[in-house]
Structure formats: structure tokens, C-alpha cells
Design a protein with these regions (language model features):
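Hydrophobic cores of alpha-helical transmembrane segments in multi-pass inner/ER membrane proteins
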Residues: 12-24, 71-84, 98, 121-134, ...
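Long, hydrophobic/aromatic-enriched structural stretches that serve as scaffold segments
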Residues: 46-107
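N-terminal signal-anchor module of multipass membrane proteins
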Residues: 1-63, 257-281
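Cytoplasm-facing juxtamembrane segments at the starts of transmembrane helices
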Residues: 33-46, 86-102, 115-123, 132-207, ...
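Structural signature of hydrophobic alpha-helical transmembrane segments
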Residues: 3-18, 58-75, 110-127, 169-179, ...
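Hydrophobic alpha-helical segments that drive targeting, anchoring, or assembly
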Residues: 41, 50, 56, 61-76, ...
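Juxtamembrane "helix-exit" motif on the non-cytosolic side of transmembrane helices
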Residues: 54-60, 105-112, 161-167, 213-216, ...
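C-terminal transmembrane helix-loop-helix hairpin of multi-pass membrane proteins
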Residues: 1-14, 170-177, 185-281
């Protein structure tokens, strides 16, 4: 048991160090090439998260045997699409990546009892939910502020607790790894280079973790959906404050951070009372 815990802690430390050191090295390598730095950083995150999936899954099976084995492949596919410098590809990259991730997640259960209507309903609702959050957060990540990093990392850490008590310790470990990777990257690279490609990889990763736990473990769909929309909801609720003349930039920043904390506490309490969590066996 002690060796198991040590190996897991070592894995999480390695993720943080790789993300931090990799971001520092890439920042110095492409200091005068911001566009190349953007591409390099989202590839770094995609590779780190894909390797994390392989570690947690005990290998990199091909073809994947379970839905969660697909997560790493989907992230690399998303990074590849974002790297293609064509306007059309850039426009559809989020749609194509999310659609692929949803299909490979739903396909195993669809082959074992779901009808076309059920499959289509889940696909449509999942895709719309992903795109809504993606669109709402689009402008938030033009610069790499502490606020932006909190909107990405904090929900991942909260989701890790929910995933664990919903019956999936493996997905919970991946969520923690994702939160650490994102936080480390923002600590080492405070520039606009951590833009939309980086955000897209992070959001897609978080979304697929929640979807997998909803379908194949015991995370209630409504709670998963609420947890998913928390960052977008916080931004939308804070927008009217930004328009007030008396609201300073710092005040708006504090309002978003406080709103994020309150929203996550509410979701956590709902999860506690609905699921009545116990440690998975």
C-alpha cells in the first residue's frame, strides 16, 4: 500500500515538474516567436496528459479497449488540428475534437444496449454543452492571468474529488494530474502564449473525464453538467459587474475568484447530499 501511494505521488510530482520545466524551456526557445510558442505549449500539455492517461491506464493500448483509453488519443488529435494553419480547420477544430471524444466515449455502451435515439440524444446534449462552455470562455483566455488559470485548474481539482467518490479512482487521478499540469504551466509561463489552443486541450480533457465517469461510473449526469458549466457560469454572472462604472478591474477579478469558489462549494454540497459518497472499494 505504501509503495502504491509513493508511486502515485511520484507520478503527480513528475507531471508538475514536466509541465513547469517544459514550459520554461519552450518559453526561452521561442521567446521571439510567440506563434510557435503557442503551438509548442499546447503540444506539451497534450503530450503530458496523454502520457498521464497511459500511465494511469497501465499502458497505451491500440486499438483502445475501453472508452477512457481514448482520452490521450483525442487530446493529441485536438493538438494536431490546432496546429494546422488553415482558417477552415481552425474554425472546426473544437467541434471536430469534441465530436470525436464524445463518439469514442459513447460507442462502447451504445454497442451494448443503447438505441439510436438514446445515442443521438446523449451525443447532441454533450456536444452542445461542450461548445457552450468553449464559446463563453473564448475571450477569457487572451492573456495568461491568474484568473484564467484558476478557472481551468480549480474545477479539475474539485472534479477529482467527485470522480473518486463516484467510483473512479483512475479518472480522479487523471483530474489531479491535469490540474497540476495546468497550474504548473501558468506558473512558469505568464504570457498570452497560453492561449486558446492550451485552453482547448484542458477543457476537452476535463470534459471527457466527466463524461466517462457519468457513463461508466456513478456520477449523476446533472451534477456532472453543473460541474462542467461552472467556469462559464461564473464568467456570465460577473459580466454585468464589469459594466458598472464603480467596479474596478481588481474588483471584477475578485468577484470572479469568489464566484468560482462559491459555485464549486455549491456543486460539492449538492454532490455530497445526492451521492452520499463513500470511498470506492
Amino acid at each position: 500500500m505504501e509503495a502504491f501511494v509513493i508511486s502515485r505521488l511520484a507520478f503527480l510530482v513528475a507531471v508538475g515538474l514536466a509541465s513547469f520545466a517544459g514550459s520554461v524551456v519552450l518559453g526561452r526557445r521561442f521567446v521571439k516567436q510567440p506563434e510557435r510558442l503557442r503551438v509548442a505549449l499546447w503540444w506539451l500539455l497534450a503530450v503530458i496528459l496523454a502520457l498521464s492517461c497511459a500511465w494511469v491506464n497501465g499502458g497505451w493500448p491500440f486499438p483502445p479497449r475501453e472508452s477512457q483509453h481514448w482520452i490521450g488519443y483525442v487530446l493529441l488529435f485536438a493538438a494536431l488540428l490546432r496546429s494546422i494553419d488553415l482558417p477552415t480547420v481552425q474554425l472546426i477544430s473544437a467541434l471536430a475534437s469534441a465530436a470525436l471524444g464524445i463518439v469514442v466515449t459513447l460507442l462502447p455502451i451504445a454497442q451494448n444496449g443503447w438505441g439510436p435515439v438514446m445515442l443521438g440524444s446523449w451525443f447532441f446534449v454533450s456536444l452542445v454543452s461542450y461548445l457552450i462552455v468553449r464559446v463563453v470562455l473564448h475571450k477569457e483566455f487572451e492573456i495568461a492571468s491568474l484568473r484564467a488559470s484558476l478557472l481551468l485548474a480549480v474545477p479539475l481539482f474539485v472534479s477529482a474529488v467527485m470522480l473518486f467518490f463516484a467510483g473512479s479512482a483512475m479518472l480522479a487521478e487523471l483530474a489531479v494530474a491535469g490540474g497540476i499540469a495546468v497550474a504548473a504551466a501558468y506558473l512558469s509561463q505568464r504570457s498570452s502564449a497560453l492561449g486558446h489552443g492550451f485552453v482547448e486541450i484542458t477543457l476537452l480533457f476535463h470534459f471527457l473525464l466527466l463524461l466517462n465517469c457519468t457513463i461508466y461510473a456513478d456520477l449523476p449526469p446533472v451534477l456532472a453538467w453543473l460541474q462542467w458549466i461552472v467556469p462559464a457560469l461564473v464568467i456570465l454572472l460577473a459580466q454585468p459587474l464589469h459594466l458598472q462604472k464603480w467596479m474596478t478591474r481588481r474588483g471584477h477579478y475578485i468577484a470572479i475568484v469568489v464566484g468560482l469558489g462559491v459555485a464549486e462549494c455549491v456543486v460539492g454540497l449538492l454532490f455530497y447530499f445526492v451521492v452520499k459518497p463513500t470511498a470506492p472499494s
